């Protein structure tokens, strides 16, 4: 029976770098990963990207950056708690401490949304719809079927791997040059768009252009290969995923109350089974005299702590199945029934009350129109470069290409690579920049 080994899974070697880091007082390789991520421009731009509510005028609701920071905090706690319990395993590397594992998961959590386009998951769907229409008109005929799938099923997770390993810092030479362990902890869907799982789950983790990077990471870490460019998950991915689930299930509801979409009483009733009445830090129970924001904040902290403990315990109990690459579903499914119900009920309330709200529909329709305008201009310009035989492109295409900066494709690249670089540019946009650019392309110059 094939089993993954912790001493390989926790590899501190950096991708794109032939030698190991010199020991540095006060910073392990995994803490350096965190620092590289948090100082990167791609991470900084998350501050102006949608979490759930596009272009909200309420500064109290979450964006991708605040969400990612909160997820990373929960992920760090999960990583430390799990490692404290399993570090006695025979193959556990002596140089890896629980706080190192916390830093790995924390870094993976920081990066988990780094490839998302403007306007959040709706932006992903809008891009897919645009390419489906473009493809129906013969626009992608210069690409192979597998290459077409990368665009027809545009995926922020695959774009995220590309951002981490290709685009930031050392462009196309390892990118951020993160450790293999952190990259493995980030790889939520270690397969390509042509894999049947990509269709059934609607997710995949690497583009055709980056499949050898996926293979390099998987082979270095000793992930179990399940098919052609298809591996099982790194066990720590489950902690990153749990941290994300915990945060967005609870925080989405808090934002819903802030925006007046949900009643505070509904959220309190949903979360109350975990802890009953929540006490103030000074020992006073919460009453109607407290502001709802304080009441929810105190309850949120208690709920998250409970869910972290439940997921950490589930990981410890399922460790061997995780190392065999056999665990089905997510960690929440193996947590205690109370934790499962809280997460499930919170997600259901968000779907029914928040994601279907009229204000969200209005903002998403506007976002779709803006992305369509941007794609209408940049994609044909990129394909013109890909088809160019005489070093000349049209005057209009030159103008679009000039706006792409370092992402501008060079004459002579394949149409597919030209489109990948174009999507690097578009996916990296913030909501605000996309709004401004779409307006300018529409003639709204003043």
Task: Identify the function of each model-found stretch.
Residues 278-417, 429:
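C-terminal subdomains that position terminal phosphate/3'-OH groups for nucleotidyl transfer/ligation
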Residues 1-22, 376, 392-446:
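Acidic, carboxylate-rich catalytic segments that either coordinate divalent cations
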Residues 31-44, 335-339:
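Acidic, low-complexity proline/glycine-rich segments
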Residues 27, 62-66:
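Low-complexity, highly charged intrinsically disordered N-terminal segments
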Residues 49-59, 349-354:
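A short small-residue
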Residues 160, 371, 426:
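A residue-level signal for conserved active-site and pocket-lining positions in enzyme catalytic cores
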Residues 43-47, 136, 169-174, 192-196, ...:
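Intrinsically disordered or highly flexible coil/loop and linker segments, enriched in small
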Residues 1-26, 38-49, 69, 73-74, ...:
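Sequence-structural signature of the catalytic-core scaffold of metal-dependent phosphohydrolases
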